[in-house]
């Protein structure tokens, strides 16, 4: 498992700009070739460069897993077209629910999903239908309702909010069928997704992430 530090647009909050699975990585248009090369070198996926809803905050607006990429209802037709044309090995679905920050409210891998508890049953069903996952439940992590903001889960492993209890870790591990650990990023931030991007090939962390945090992240995502 390869790990490296990264900054984007002068910030360590790299996860707000990046969505990745094991096949594709979606990022906004970035002029810095070294940044793009590092992302591709660590995550080892095809790179898709686009805005989402005219925003560079791809990681906040997009979610999914190795089978499907979920886009918010505000995604523009040309953005959807770009992703569908390039991400040919996964489904691309637009989810018509009230919230648009899908990356913050839906935490998913190919085995399960944890979803923002304030969604209506109709909205939950739309998310389940888009994901095509039977095991999708509403919940929180460490009493945080924006579950996608405080965890990163792959099909191999995951890291969640440092204050998640042992019972929470056990239940989440059973839901996602992977080993989990808790930790922080970017010198103490509990908002894991903002500072960590991971797939089965590698991990990127914000440049402020400390050595102790990196050791914990490496332990979480090690083979």
From Swiss-Prot:
Gene3D superfamilies according to UniProt: L-arginine/glycine Amidinotransferase, Chain A
Keyword presence, Endoplasmic reticulum: no
Pfam entry (one): eIF-6
Protein keywords: Initiation factor, Protein biosynthesis
Molecular functions (GO terms): ribosome binding; translation initiation factor activity
Keyword Phosphoprotein among UniProt keywords: no
CDD domains to which the protein is assigned, alphabetical: IF6 (cd00527)
GO BP terms: cytosolic ribosome assembly
Protein purpose: Binds to the 50S ribosomal subunit and prevents its association with the 30S ribosomal subunit to form the 70S initiation complex.
Similarity-based family: Belongs to the eIF-6 family.
Protein name, UniProt field: Translation initiation factor 6
């Amino acid at each position: 498992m390869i790990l490296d530090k990264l900054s984007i647009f002068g910030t360590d909050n790299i996860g707000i700009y990046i969505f990745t699975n094991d096949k594709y990585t979606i990022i906004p248009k970035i002029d810095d070739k070294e940044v793009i090369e590092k992302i591709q070198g660590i995550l080892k996926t095809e790179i898709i460069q686009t805005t989402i809803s005219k925003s560079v905050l791809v990681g906040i607006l997009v979610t999914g897993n190795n089978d499907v990429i979920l886009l918010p209802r505000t995604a523009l037709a040309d953005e959807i077209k770009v992703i569908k044309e390039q991400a040919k090995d996964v489904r691309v679905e637009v989810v018509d629910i009230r919230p648009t920050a899908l990356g913050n409210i839906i935490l998913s891998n190919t085995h399960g999903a944890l979803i923002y508890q304030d969604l209506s049953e109709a909205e939950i069903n739309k998310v389940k239908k888009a994901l095509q996952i039977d095991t999708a439940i509403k919940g929180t992590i460490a009493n945080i309702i924006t579950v996608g903001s405080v965890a990163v889960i792959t099909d191999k492993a995951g890291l969640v909010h440092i204050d998640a209890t042992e019972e929470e870790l056990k239940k989440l591990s059973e839901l996602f069928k992977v080993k989990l650990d808790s930790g922080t990023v970017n010198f103490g931030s509990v908002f894991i997704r903002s500072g960590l991007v991971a797939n089965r090939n590698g991990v990127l962390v914000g440049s402020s992430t400390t050595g102790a945090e990196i050791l914990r992240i490496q332990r979480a995502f090690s083979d």
